[in-house]
From Swiss-Prot:
Pfam families: RNase_H. One of its GO terms (biological process) is DNA replication, removal of RNA primer. Mg(2+) 1 binds at residues 10, 48, 70. The gene is rnhA. InterPro entries: RNase_H, RNaseH-like_sf, RNaseH_domain, RNaseH_sf, RNaseHI. Its EC number is 3.1.26.4. It catalyses: Endonucleolytic cleavage to 5'-phosphomonoester. The keyword Aminoacyl-tRNA synthetase does not apply. Its main location: cytoplasm. This is Ribonuclease H.
Length: 146
């Protein structure tokens, strides 16, 4: 039986594009682990994806994951089938334009094949303490350039 892990993620950007940061909170039972990172030149969407990637990569074995994000871009791509359509359309959108951030989407595809992941949308900058913590981690990563 796989371990059940809850993950919250958030990405932030100072300017879009601009300096970016991401934050993640992984929870397994009573254990909590915080992760964050920085990029000197990026976009908000890339940081949202990177938060999910880094959190899933931090898992040491295949897990059952509930991943919570305030990013409609991330959650809708999975839950509304956009990612599946993009891959079957040779990485083209419904408008026949190239999908942005293909490198990161390919990483997410690999990770969701390894783990059993369900994606959940949460309201950003609201009263969700875990999402707010990830936002803090992401903005601090930008502030501290690391």
């Amino acid at each position: 039986m796989q371990k059940k892990v809850t993950i919250y993620t958030d990405g932030a950007c100072s300017g879009n594009p601009g300096k970016g940061g991401w934050g993640a909170l992984l929870m397994f039972g009573s254990v909590k682990r915080e992760l964050s990172g920085y990029s000197p030149a990026t976009t908000n969407n890339r940081m949202e994806l990177m938060a999910a990637i880094q959190a899933l990569e931090a898992l040491k074995e295949p897990c059952e994951v509930a991943l919570y994000s305030d990013s409609s871009y991330l959650v809708n791509a999975i839950n509304k089938g956009w990612l599946k359509r993009w891959t079957s359309n040779n990485w083209k959108t419904a408008a026949k334009k190239p999908v942005e951030n293909i490198d990161l989407w390919k990483m997410i595809l690999e990770l969701i094949r390894l783990h059993s992941v369900t994606f959940h949308k949460v309201k950003g900058h609201s009263d969700n303490e875990f999402n707010n913590r990830c936002d803090y981690l992401a903005t601090q990563a930008i502030k501290n350039n690391r």
